[in-house]
């Protein structure tokens, strides 16, 4: 008796570019064999706005407000890297107090970034409840930003060459510590609700596994790299700002799957809380009004309270500040991974070349590789675990 052969033809399906699970205007051209993914081609560029070319036609002071719109979940990180590049090229010192203020803002942004990742990721895999919890804590971070910078989510325009735009308002550090006291138990609450949930674990464990060598060869960074067993964090490696002053650990896992990436991000929020607590206690000068009062009553003009480390900016940079001749690449660790800037100056007020390295663009490149062999229902979970914001991918 002759056996019948079953032939299946591949089917091409378009995901996006306008879909709630695409995390922006990302289009995936997916080739399916039944429910199995056999190929995937990401199509990017829908949100390209020419940010690098804009940088080459703006002074640094004019360009800082632009960059928080690239990645609305990591605005402070992009502000920091945009001022760090000319600072290092021109050897401009940063006061210790300003560096501590920067660290406070960056770590608050890291927590906000991971919270904004956590809620939609859980919604993608079917857990709706925590999606509403994370915005409660994010609002508290927005309130802290609003008190210090005047803006909430984006366009904080707070970082400056040589420091920050203004000092922290009186009472801000106490409010920041209050937030830490509130948020610490909330992370425990998230973990009780999510981490050992059998449905959640069964849904994402073993999905999108990336081996250690693959993570290195694909130039992954951030939680994507650390979840594959590579303890690499630029805050430890490059020791930029004042991270060497604090006692904290690199969060890493070995499994390399979606669940490991979740565990890394949750642990990073705990470590960021620890850094914020230490920075609030160790910041030179303490609360602003106390610092100003000490300056007024100090008769000895040589007192350290008048030193550079107690200022919030080394020197107000003029709009005519010229970027010196030379080139360099500088980088920092954002919530998504390594973001960097290659700057080339020619002694003009605008840079001759300003190349931006976005962490999520590099991390997104491995998506077709880890999707092959997965089920169509797992595409959203794997994509969600990468954490992409298309504004910074396309720039």
Swiss-Prot record:
Protein localization: Cellular thylakoid membrane
EC number(s) on file: 7.1.1.-
GO terms classed as biological process: photosynthesis, light reaction
Membrane-protein topology: Peripheral membrane protein
Enzyme class: translocase
Keyword Thylakoid: yes
Gene3D superfamilies, per the entry: Cytochrome-c3 Hydrogenase, chain B
Entry keywords, A to Z: Membrane, NAD, NADP, Plastoquinone, Quinone, Thylakoid, Translocase, Transport
GO molecular function terms noted in the UniProt entry: NAD binding; oxidoreductase activity, acting on NAD(P)H, quinone or similar compound as acceptor; quinone binding
UniProt keyword NAD present: yes
InterPro entries named in the record: NADH_Q_OxRdtase_suD, NADH_UbQ_OxRdtase_49kDa_CS, NDH1_su_D/H, NiFe-Hase_large
One Pfam family cited in the UniProt record for this chain: Complex1_49kDa
Substrates-to-products reaction catalysed: a plastoquinone + NADH + (n+1) H(+)(in) = a plastoquinol + NAD(+) + n H(+)(out); a plastoquinone + NADPH + (n+1) H(+)(in) = a plastoquinol + NADP(+) + n H(+)(out)
GO cellular component, one term: plasma membrane-derived thylakoid membrane
Summary of subunit composition and partner proteins: NDH-1 can be composed of about 15 different subunits; different subcomplexes with different compositions have been identified which probably have different functions.
Family classification: Belongs to the complex I 49 kDa subunit family.
Its biological purpose: NDH-1 shuttles electrons from an unknown electron donor, via FMN and iron-sulfur (Fe-S) centers, to quinones in the respiratory and/or the photosynthetic chain. The immediate electron acceptor for the enzyme in this species is believed to be plastoquinone. Couples the redox reaction to proton translocation, and thus conserves the redox energy in a proton gradient. Cyanobacterial NDH-1 also plays a role in inorganic carbon-concentration.
Name of the molecule in the record: NAD(P)H-quinone oxidoreductase subunit H
Gene source species: Prochlorococcus marinus (strain AS9601)
């Amino acid at each position: 008796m002759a056996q019948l052969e079953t032939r299946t033809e591949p089917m091409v399906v378009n995901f996006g570019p306008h879909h709630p699970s695409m995390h922006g205007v990302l289009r995936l051209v997916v080739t399916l064999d039944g429910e199995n993914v056999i190929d995937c081609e990401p199509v990017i560029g829908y949100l390209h706005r020419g940010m690098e070319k804009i940088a080459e036609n703006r002074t640094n002071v004019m360009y800082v407000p632009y960059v928080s719109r690239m990645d609305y979940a990591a605005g402070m990180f992009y502000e920091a890297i945009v001022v760090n590049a000319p600072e290092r090229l021109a050897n401009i010192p940063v006061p210790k107090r300003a560096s501590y203020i920067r660290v406070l803002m960056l770590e608050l942004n890291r927590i906000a970034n991971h919270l904004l990742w956590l809620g939609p990721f859980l919604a993608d895999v079917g857990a709706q409840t925590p999606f509403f919890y994370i915005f409660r804590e994010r609002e508290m971070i927005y309130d802290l930003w609003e008190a210090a910078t005047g803006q909430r989510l984006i366009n904080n325009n707070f970082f400056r060459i040589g420091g920050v735009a203004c000092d922290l308002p009186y009472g801000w550090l106490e409010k920041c510590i209050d937030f830490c006291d509130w948020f610490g138990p909330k992370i425990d609450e998230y973990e009780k609700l999510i981490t050992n949930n059998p449905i959640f674990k069964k849904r994402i464990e073993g999905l999108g596994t990336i081996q250690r060598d693959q993570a290195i060869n694909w130039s992954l960074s951030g939680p994507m790299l650390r979840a594959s067993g590579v303890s690499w964090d630029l805050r430890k490696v490059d020791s930029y700002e004042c991270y060497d002053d604090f006692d904290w650990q690199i969060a890493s896992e070995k499994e390399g799957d979606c669940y490991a990436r979740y565990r890394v991000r949750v642990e990073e929020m705990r470590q960021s809380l620890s850094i914020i607590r230490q920075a609030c206690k160790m910041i030179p000068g303490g609360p602003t009004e106390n610092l100003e009062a000490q300056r007024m009553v100090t008769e000895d003009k040589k007192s350290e309270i008048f030193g550079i480390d107690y200022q919030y900016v080394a020197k107000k940079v003029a709009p005519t500040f010229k970027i010196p001749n030379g080139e360099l690449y500088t980088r920092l660790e954002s919530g998504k991974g390594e973001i960097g800037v290659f700057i080339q100056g020619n002694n003009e007020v605008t840079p001759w070349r300003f190349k931006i390295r976005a962490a999520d663009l590099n991390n997104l490149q491995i998506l077709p590789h880890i999707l092959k062999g997965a089920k169509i229902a797992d595409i959203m979970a794997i994509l969600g675990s990468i954490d992409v914001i298309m504004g910074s991918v396309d720039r």
